[in-house]
Swiss-Prot record:
Belongs to the eIF-6 family. It comes from Danio rerio (Zebrafish). InterPro entries: eIF6 (IPR002769). CDD domains: IF6 (cd00527). This is Eukaryotic translation initiation factor 6. Pfam families: eIF-6. GO terms for molecular function: ribosomal large subunit binding; translation initiation factor activity.
Amino acid sequence: MAVRASFEKNNEIGCFAKLTNTYCLVAIGGSENFYSVFEGELSETMPVIHASIAGCRIIGRMCVGNRHGLLVPNNTTDQELQHIRNCLPDSVRIQRVEERLSALGNVIACNDYVALVHPDLDRETEEILADTLKVEVFRQTVAEQVLVGSYCAFSNQGGLVHAKTSIEDQDELSSLLQVPLVAGTVNRGSEVIAAGMVVNDWCAFCGLDTTSTELSVIESVFRLSETQPSAIATTMRDSLIDSLT
């Protein structure tokens, strides 16, 4: 299921929301309509949390997370941290990170198993990322862009990357992530994929400008038409990975 939405007439909804398989963060303020779009699709399966990070509403660009954990920058206030921690499921760890590249969502892209990071990300941040989110970390670029968190979006089912990503790069990234990738756009031609959409294993939200062609590509590569929130697939994949490692 792919749904269109906008935040105060802004189509870059990936800046104002962070979606994983176990929780969703939505920026405070804004119209109740934006929040209710997420609430309507997700409320039966996960908490939808109003939040700010470091006093900012662009929470999607400030943090990075998956079903195991959430990393936020060091300038996140104690109140913000406590509020998010209280609302998250008990199994999800939240961790503050001292990192020069503090817009973590721009420099890290991840699913529940693998993370792509900016080539200059601090070594300590990489270790915290691997430990808290339980992912394998690769330093990569996407279409020669170092802001990997901005120019791709991927789930455990598939991924969308910058339209100018070469076939060779797509193949390399796909083999690292172990999911199929497609080069494409959102919001009627925008190559800043992660700013224009958020996605998990069964649901995607895109900016209002996203065309029906872009939506059908998204539904296809992320396999949204065939999946429902399911603990079974996750458990099967976890046990398969355990048996391979």
